[in-house]
Amino acid sequence: MSVSTLFQQNNNNIYNKSNTLTNTPSNPTGNTNTLWSNSGFNPPHLMYGASDVTAAINNIAFETGTFNLQLSGPWASPISHAVSYTKINNLVNLTIPTYQAQATTLASISSIVGALPTNLRPVNNPEIDFEIFVLDNGTRTTNPGLITLLSNGQILIYKDNNLGQFTVGSGGSGFNPFSITYMI
């Protein structure tokens, strides 16, 4: 293809709506409530087990709040902060603030069992893992860190996705704020 063909005038009028699709597939199911036909269309509110939009809205459980999360491990003393959460039915979003201090011990970061409130725990999975950016001795690690939420409410954070421990040093170790979203 030459450069001159790239600059040829476009003779196709994109605003002309008279052209129709000629290769439209036929309805393979014969049903009227499919993508092939909009008669008898089932609206999205039926996903929530409701017969109409008002009932669907009433079926949505929305909850927000905070809980205190104390993490310990590589630091001289535990660090506590308020963690914000939003829960919509079985979808949970956690917003976790900065946890960072000088590492005085070679260790991963962990909470006690039960630190994650019962209504926010991943009960259908023994654990949920997320990769996050972490700092080890003041430097962001090459490999992403790993946060693990256990069904018993414990939270574990590793220096990398190989379950590495944070190293002792004068720079800060931990992580900057982040959010994670998961299903329970």
Curated annotation (Swiss-Prot):
Source organism superkingdom: Viruses
Subcellular location as annotated: Virion
Cellular component, GO annotation: virion component
Span list, region Disordered: 14-35
Keywords from the named record: Virion
Family to which the UniProt record says this protein belongs: Belongs to the sputnik virus V6 family.
Record's protein name: Structural protein V8
Phylogenetic lineage: Viruses, Varidnaviria, Bamfordvirae, Preplasmiviricota, Maveriviricetes
